Amino acid sequence: TAVAKPGTDQIQYPLAEQKLRIQTKSGIDVEIVLSSQDDRLEVQMQSSGELNDAERVALGNLADAFQDAIDGISAKDPVLNLSGLAKFDSTVLASVDFHSSITLNQKGPQTLDFHADSVSRSVKLDGPLGTLDVSVDMRDSSVWGNSKQRAAAIDNYIKQFDKAASRGNADKALATMFKDAFTQMNSDYVAPSQQPKITLADV
């Protein structure tokens, strides 16, 4: 929520909230929230229970990935850096969710929502930059074959998308983020033996 500067009606930009929510296989929820307004930063962390050693290590291993995701979406020319979060330790953690909301001006917030668990991944982007929605169902092992075949299939999808984007004069920044999302959602599977079924929605 935008907040006016004390004593004025003027909202101080930029406003940002970055949230990482992790659920362990033992059922513990951990949430880390970074909020900033103008030059002020607030950090909150809460856990629904006590973590064991393996869970603490698994969470610690996501620290750089969390920072990469924040740096990417907060950049002057935003990019998606979600690969690190997608490669969470699935032997200890059940799911990872990343939410980002950044408001640079009166045009409203740019939001990003990423989810990954052992069978699915999704990323949704909405705001002034545009809208995209990419989801992957990794339960169908018959769709993409081995890693080499999968890489070739992804490359083919990207080439088709480039042609369609060129014909439709798509926004270059949004097109780049879509390709990043598509590639990252279909790479480095949590369970290598599982292959994904890819679904595309609203670009």
Feature map (PLM): residue ranges:
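Type III/flagellar secretion export determinants
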Residues: T1-V203
